[in-house]
């Protein structure tokens, strides 16, 4: 009996060490047979006491993990789990769209995984997103700038536990709201490499898809985008331009003419799927909906056998939600314009790929083109189509600051609408080839 406290302490040490160091996942419920790639999951503690525990999924490159680039993938939201990227956009697995029957939903292999040519860390952030959690009540409200520092610390600690990847070329990547986080993170890493942190992270650049960049610009370009896509009439477009004077979403309440015209605009567009105007605005609980796998994800990941397989800490969170901050957790959006970070990163010489699904109404490609133009870098390669098997997959332009802009034809707010095309675009760019 006297040895019981020592055994308990030893057990706690083993559990904490096991969680923090990462665990290999060889099988996943819903997938037949062993996984055809190397998956590791785990937590990295943040802060002096490491009370914040950030959860990650790490997948090794299927080609040459010792030399291939190391990517960090952040999903948007803020507060959406990175498994959104893994299972819906650029990972090696996807949920099979089959009517839910009470059993664990099925997983299938994909042909468009970015892990074919890169090692990828899919990180659940901020605190409370996915399986990331805090052991103690938070004193400060999570924020953009706070998460940038947390993610930087995560990377330093993760690489210290995985030193074999320290020399791999590193790229930060993400989409949607990550457009606020990734550019600031790149700047933070760059500064840290010179000031505080050894060994330095081998930072080479960043990748962003349909990035939220400057709320006012992103929103205001929805009007010209809607006109160009024939969603509103010429007459409404000319009237709204004249009476709103380019400010469509933060309208002076005294400007009644503009308010009425904006109301007419919403009548024409509110029933659309704003994430891809070509896709139906459907109920995700319906098996006929393109996004039905999102509904299945909740059943899959909340199944106890799945959480056990992923080595999720049982005392961490209750029911998993794909996006948390939009619903119930306070968050301080203290970066309202990430353009200055892009400018600083350009000056530092980092490569960047900025891509836009050209049927996204949330962050229209026109808005992204506008802020890129505001950087005032000269054009190296003029606007041209990029091709896949003699077919136009989108259009691209490159700039003197090592920035490549590309559209993905027919795609929407995220890569899931055209995953094969987005993968080929990524594969060419990350290899240093022209699109």
Curated annotation (Swiss-Prot):
Keyword Lyase among UniProt keywords: no
Gene3D superfamilies with a match to the protein in the record: alpha/beta hydrolase
Record protein name field: Serine carboxypeptidase-like 12
UniProt tissue specificity: Expressed in roots.
Pfam families per record: Peptidase_S10
Compartments in which it is found: Secreted
InterPro entries (UniProt xref): AB_hydrolase_fold, Peptidase_S10
GO CC annotations, alphabetized: extracellular region
Main location: secreted
Glycosylated position list: 101, 313, 336, 344, 376, 420
Function text: Probable carboxypeptidase.
Gene Ontology process terms (BP): proteolysis
Record carries keyword Glycosyltransferase: no
Gene this protein is translated from: SCPL12
Disulfide bond residue pairs: 80-323, 244-258, 282-289
């Amino acid at each position: 009996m006297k040895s019981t406290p020592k055994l308990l302490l030893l057990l706690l040490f083993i559990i904490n060490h096991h969680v923090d160091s990462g665990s290999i996942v060889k099988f996943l419920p819903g997938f037949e047979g062993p996984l055809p790639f190397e998956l590791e999951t785990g937590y990295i503690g943040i802060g002096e006491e490491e009370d914040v525990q950030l959860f990650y999924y790490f997948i090794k490159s299927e080609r040459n993990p010792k030399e291939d680039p190391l990517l960090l993938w952040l999903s948007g939201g803020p507060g959406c789990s990175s498994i959104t990227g893994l299972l819906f956009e650029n990972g090696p697995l996807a949920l099979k769209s089959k009517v839910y029957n009470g059993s664990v939903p099925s997983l299938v292999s994909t042909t468009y995984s970015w892990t074919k040519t890169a090692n990828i860390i899919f990180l659940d952030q901020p605190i409370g997103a996915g399986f990331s959690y805090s052991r103690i009540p938070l004193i400060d409200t999570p924020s953009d700038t706070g998460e940038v520092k947390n993610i930087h610390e995560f990377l330093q600690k993760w690489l210290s536990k995985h030193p074999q990847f320290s020399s791999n070329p590193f790229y930060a990547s993400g989409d949607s709201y990550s457009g606020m986080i990734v550019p600031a993170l790149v700047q933070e890493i760059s500064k840290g490499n010179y000031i505080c942190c050894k060994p330095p992270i081998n930072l080479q650049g960043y990748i962003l898809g349909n990035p939220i960049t400057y709320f006012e610009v992103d929103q205001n370009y929805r009007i010209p985008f809607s006109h160009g896509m024939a969603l509103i009439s010429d007459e409404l477009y000319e009237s709204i331009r004249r009476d709103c004077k380019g400010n469509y979403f933060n309208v002076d309440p005294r400007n009644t003419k503009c308010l009425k015209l904006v109301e007419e605009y919403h009548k024409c567009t509110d029933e659309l799927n704003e994430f891809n105007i070509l896709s139906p605005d459907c109920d995700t609980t319906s098996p006929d909906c393109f996004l039905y796998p999102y509904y299945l994800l909740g059943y899959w990941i909340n199944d106890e056998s799945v959480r056990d397989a992923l080595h999720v800490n049982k005392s961490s969170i209750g029911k998993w939600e794909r996006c948390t901050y939009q619903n119930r957790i306070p968050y301080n959006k203290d970066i309202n314009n990430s353009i200055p970070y892009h400018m600083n990163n350009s000056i530092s010489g980092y490569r960047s790929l900025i891509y836009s699904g050209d049927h996204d109404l949330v962050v229209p490609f026109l808005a992204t083109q506008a802020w890129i133009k505001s950087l005032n870098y000269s054009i190296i390669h003029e606007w041209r189509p990029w091709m896949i098997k003699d077919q136009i997959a989108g259009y691209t332009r490159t700039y003197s600051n090592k920035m490549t802009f590309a559209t993905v034809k027919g795609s929407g707010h995220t890569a899931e609408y055209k995953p094969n095309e987005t993968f080929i675009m990524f594969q060419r760019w990350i290899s240093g080839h022209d699109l």
